[in-house]
């Protein structure tokens, strides 16, 4: 049970970091494009952040 709680806490922490990195990247894109960010860019950033978080977790357990 402790291992499960620890794993869930780790996933939550990594998810929070990934989302904050996506927000920073989106902010940088807005500055480059004069404030315009397409919906496609937002989705790509979120999905890449999630994928990076999953890869990190899997590398720790694998």
UniProtKB/Swiss-Prot annotation:
Q: Which InterPro entries match?
A: Frog_antimicrobial_propeptide
Tissue specificity, please?
Expressed by the skin glands.
Q: Where in the cell is it found?
A: Secreted
| GO terms for cellular component | extracellular region
Give start-end of the signal peptide: 1-22
Q: Which Pfam families match?
A: FSAP_sig_propep (PF03032)
Main subcellular location: secreted
User: Into which family does the record put it?
Assistant: Belongs to the frog skin active peptide (FSAP) family. Brevinin subfamily.
Q: What does this protein do?
A: Antimicrobial peptide. Active against a variety of Gram-negative and Gram-positive bacterial strains. Not active against fungi. Shows weak hemolytic activity against human erythrocytes.
Q: What is this protein called?
A: Amolopin-p-MT1
Lineage summary: Eukaryota, Metazoa, Chordata, Craniata, Vertebrata
């Amino acid at each position: 049970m402790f291992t499960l709680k620890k794993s869930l806490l780790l996933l939550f922490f990594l998810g929070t970091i990934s989302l904050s990195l996506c927000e920073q990247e989106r902010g940088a894109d807005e500055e480059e494009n004069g404030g315009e960010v397409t919906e496609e860019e937002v989705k790509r950033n979120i999905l890449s952040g999630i994928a990076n978080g999953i890869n990190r977790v899997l590398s720790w357990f694998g």
